């Protein structure tokens, strides 16, 4: 999932920055292109020239959000101790500490129909997290099936904690889910 941000003009970058803040803070459906254009200091025509449609702008927002989060995630992985899969909780907790409206991808999934042009960015983000967790769990689990199963458990724990974090602005669910994941990952591998 790569964005075209490097090829964006300064005006397009500003539009994307403003739209990202508004979509996350107020919700995708609550924010119109008039508001985005006005707060970006551009005309609607410029917005449409740069992105083509609000749907394409939403997709760009989600791709950008993924890249920023992924960068933070990989930085944490690089310095983590075993089991490194637990850093997923820290990465989401860091993100949630900076913002308190929950997961941008879960929020977008709640607003967008599955056939929306931007929905694939949601699926790609969640699948990338799931796949990376499987790689990290496999570092400590030689059996690929067991590693995949445990990674799925960790993924579901973190997803549930993310949703709960967005509901009540508490870190407790994330801490509890992390403890459960540690218990799962600290158990002896199942003999095959």
Per-range role (PLM):
Residues 60, 71-101, 146, 150-154:
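Hydrophobic alpha-helical connector segments
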Residues 1-26, 30-39, 56:
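Basic, helix-initiating cap at the start of DNA-binding domains
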Residues 118-123, 140-192:
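Hydrophobic/aromatic-rich alpha-helical bundle segments in the mid-to-C-terminal region
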Residues 25-28, 41, 48-64:
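HTH DNA-binding helix-turn interface
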Residues 13, 17, 45, 103:
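Short alpha-helical elements of helix-turn-helix
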Residues 67-70, 74-76, 83-86, 115-141, ...:
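Amphipathic alpha-helical packing segments from all-alpha helical-bundle domains
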Residues 97-119:
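Amphipathic alpha-helical segments used for helix-helix packing
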């Amino acid at each position: 999932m790569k964005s075209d941000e490097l090829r964006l003009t300064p005006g397009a970058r500003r539009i994307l920055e403003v739209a990202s803040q508004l979509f996350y803070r107020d919700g995708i459906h609550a924010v119109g292109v008039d508001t985005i254009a006005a707060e970006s200091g551009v005309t609607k025509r410029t917005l449409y020239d740069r992105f083509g449609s609000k749907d394409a702008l939403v997709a760009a927002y989600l791709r950008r959000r993924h890249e920023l989060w992924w960068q933070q995630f990989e930085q944490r992985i690089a310095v983590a101790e075993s089991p490194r899969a637990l850093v997923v909780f820290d990465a989401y907790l860091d993100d949630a500490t900076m913002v308190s409206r929950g997961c941008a991808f879960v929020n977008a999934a709640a607003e967008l129909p599955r056939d929306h042009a931007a929905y694939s960015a949601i699926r790609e983000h969640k699948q990338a997290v799931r796949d990376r967790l499987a790689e990290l769990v496999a570092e400590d689990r030689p059996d690929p099936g067991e590693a995949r199963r445990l990674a799925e458990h960790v993924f579901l724990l973190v997803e549930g904690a993310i949703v709960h974090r967005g509901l009540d602005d508490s870190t407790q669910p994330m801490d509890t889910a992390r403890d459960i994941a540690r218990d799962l990952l600290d158990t002896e591998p199942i003999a095959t």
